[in-house]
């Protein structure tokens, strides 16, 4: 397992993944905390002719549910993309500290798998 920070940046992610590829270390999963980092990681895989996505050599996981990223899922180039809203943190903190019980949903958290995503999902949930 190799873990490095790409600082939310596609170019930095590409450099990191390229360095891992160049090291000869084997891997089969890219887990990126945002879609841009996943995009950069995939660029390094593509440059090295390493297959990725459904049924391929490397599983690709991103977060943010950008429309373009969901389209990568739909095409089978990525395996999973999720939406996790950081704005919920203040609400959760308030519940813990003050016992607030009213439900506030800022954004539904979603997750999409490449084997089940539909064009409607891309249209309805892509940002």
Regions found by a protein language model. Give the residues of each.
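A residue-level marker of the well-folded mature domains of exported/periplasmic proteins
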Residues: 1-127
């Amino acid at each position: 397992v190799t873990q490095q920070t790409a600082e939310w940046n596609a170019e930095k992610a590409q450099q990191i993944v390229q360095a891992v590829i160049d090291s000869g270390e084997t891997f089969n999963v890219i887990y990126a905390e945002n879609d841009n980092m996943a995009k950069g990681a995939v660029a390094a895989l593509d440059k090295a002719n390493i297959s990725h996505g459904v049924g391929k050599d490397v599983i690709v996981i991103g977060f943010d549910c950008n429309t373009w990223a969901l389209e990568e899922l739909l095409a089978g180039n990525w395996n999973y993309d999720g939406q996790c809203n950081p704005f919920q943190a203040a609400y959760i903190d308030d519940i813990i500290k003050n016992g607030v019980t009213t439900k506030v949903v800022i954004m539904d958290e979603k997750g999409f798998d490449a084997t089940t995503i539909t064009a409607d999902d891309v249209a309805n949930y892509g940002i």
